[in-house]
Amino acid sequence: MATHILFETATGFNIFQLSGMESIAEFTDQVQKSMQDFSKFSKVCKMVGSLPFTSAENALENINSISEGILTESLHDFLKQTFSKKTEGVVLGVCDNKLSASIGDELKISCLSNSHTSEIIRCIRNHISEFTKLKSADLLKAQLGLGHSYSRSKVKFNVHKVDNMIIQSICLLEQLDKDLNTFFMRLREWYSWHFPELLKIIESQVHFAKLAKLIQNKKNLTEESLDEIKEILEDNESLAKDVLSAAKASMGGDISQIDLVTVMHFADRVISLDEYRTNLTQYLAKKMQDIAPNLSALVGDRIGAKLISRAGSLTSLAKYPASTVQILGAEKALFRAMKVRGKTPKYGIIFNASAVSSETKNKGRIARCLSNKISIATRIDCFSDNPTAKFGVALKQQVADRIKFFNNGVAPKRNLDVMKEVIEEVEKDFAEEEVKPVVKESSSKKRKESEPTEEKSSKKSKKEEKSSKKSKSDDVEMKEEPVKEEKKSSKKSSSKKEEEPVKEEKKSSSKKEDKKEKKESKKDEKEEKKSSKKDKKEKK
């Protein structure tokens, strides 16, 4: 019986403590009704700890780990802190079995995950807004945001990498081939009752159906329809004339109008199905170029699509070893041989590849080499960010070189050297693709810059004209100004010359006066000294 419950929400982790488990364990109708009342349920279940998520990224990281049964560091520390005092007697109820096992292994806490625990968690979920004191609208927003980000991380895929379209297309194409073959045979037998010679002249099934639709009743066929017959037979005039002559001398019986209409309806349906098959073939080729260009270049669109369909997906095919790819499609023969202890098959679907089917000798060795190259090509297609068919072309050339080696003994290039050359070519191509848009942008910028420069030049020319007019008027003014300045300067110079001698005269007169004053002061001092000496003598 669980004593505590670990509950995860979009906002964080919560731990609840349970009490009175005897009544809850019964889960009668009365107990279930009381569980719906929060006041009663809160007496039995109390929240003892909570760990809110710090951000949306933190919430997504924790939820991703919990969904895989991994114990995160934050949850580890939270549980350790909550049950730090006592772990004995604690039984933690956890919703996920894997998570409960990882908690028990790391923290040595006994965990429980059963129907009783899930019922209690359901009741907690019903009252979580009251426990956390959060509004139900806020909880719903958090759940929506986390749910969208979680699903986005799980359902992350590239639209061009949808190999399911290839699987469905090749299955439908194979079925169409079988059905169309049956329908063409039925049309031949049906229309041959009326015109049996046409079956011997025309070998192509599509041409036979189109001619049957054109001719209808052989009695109405004339030479006027020769051009139309030539158009159907791709401008083969001799065959067209043979059809005309055979219609005139035909041994077939007459056919009623009702029977002829029925045959023509069936011919229309067969022709439309053949057109749909050609469109589907083109669609498959385009999809193979988008999803597995190297595999398509190595073995062709249809064989590559068959391999992907047999493996289940491109990723599954990329994970297969070369030995499994070699016998893919020959599982029945393989298990039959293993049961009887006979020889195992050397090839499966890849037998239809031109490299294997065209050779009479060394088919097993060529199939082994081709399966090795297929496994390399599928891994490049599956895990490369920039799809390119150059690796597939190089691998196909390696298979051709290996066939030459088996037949003539000419040593092929090393795989390492070939791959280095291809990688250099691919890097050059991507560098050129990155440079092209930059060149376009710079040219557009130059064009934009050139347009305003032309406007600026026109504006400048207008300004220069105005400035030239102004400069002429300024020159006239400048010529007049120096004359005025010369007159002013002459007046100033004459006044200065007159002022200078006056200043010199004043200076000389002031010097003379100073000398006279000094002489007088010296005389006065001498007289005072003499008078002072006389006074001293008289006192004595």
UniProtKB/Swiss-Prot annotation:
Keywords: Nucleus, Ribosome biogenesis. It comes from Dictyostelium discoideum (Social amoeba). PROSITE patterns: NOP (PS51358). This is Nucleolar protein 56. Residues 434-488, 495-530 have a biased composition (Basic and acidic residues). One of its GO terms (biological process) is ribosomal small subunit biogenesis. Probably involved in the early to middle stages of 60S ribosomal subunit biogenesis. As a component of box C/D small nucleolar ribonucleoprotein (snoRNP) complexes could function in methylation of ribosomal RNAs (rRNAs). The gene is nop56. The lineage of its organism: Eukaryota, Amoebozoa, Evosea, Eumycetozoa, Dictyostelia. GO terms for cellular component: box C/D methylation guide snoRNP complex; nucleolus; small-subunit processome; sno(s)RNA-containing ribonucleoprotein complex.
